[in-house]
Amino acid sequence: CAAVSDFICANPKDGKIKKDQMGDKIELKLNIDILKNLNLKCKKIGFKMEMDAKNALNNAKDMLKNKNLDAVCLNILGDDIKFGSNETKISFITKDTVMQTSLAQKEIIASQITKLAKNI
């Protein structure tokens, strides 16, 4: 799975855009919030990546509430967690608990998330 982008191209073009036809900027617009508008009767778990460790937990809790989620997997990028790394750690946040995983391979974290999700 991949995350849906928060932003999309404001003026998409068909085909390839050549470098010399590109210009010096790309205009973006806000994409539809699929998770917020999902009305299925299932467990809804959001994934949030933050770089601001100070506000990350509050931002994740706001996401949990505002999007009516069952849980949020919070990933904070920093010295030990880099974008594109094979290792990560997450905070699994529900309305009642915050559980922290240890730094591990992403496949192991995915398995842990699956187990945690079964208990909500």
Would you name each region that the model predicts?
Residues 1-81, 91:
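Glycine-rich phosphate/dinucleotide-binding loop and adjoining beta-alpha-beta core of small-molecule
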Residues 76-120:
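Small-residue (G/A/S/T)-rich helix-start motifs and N-terminal tracts that mark the onset
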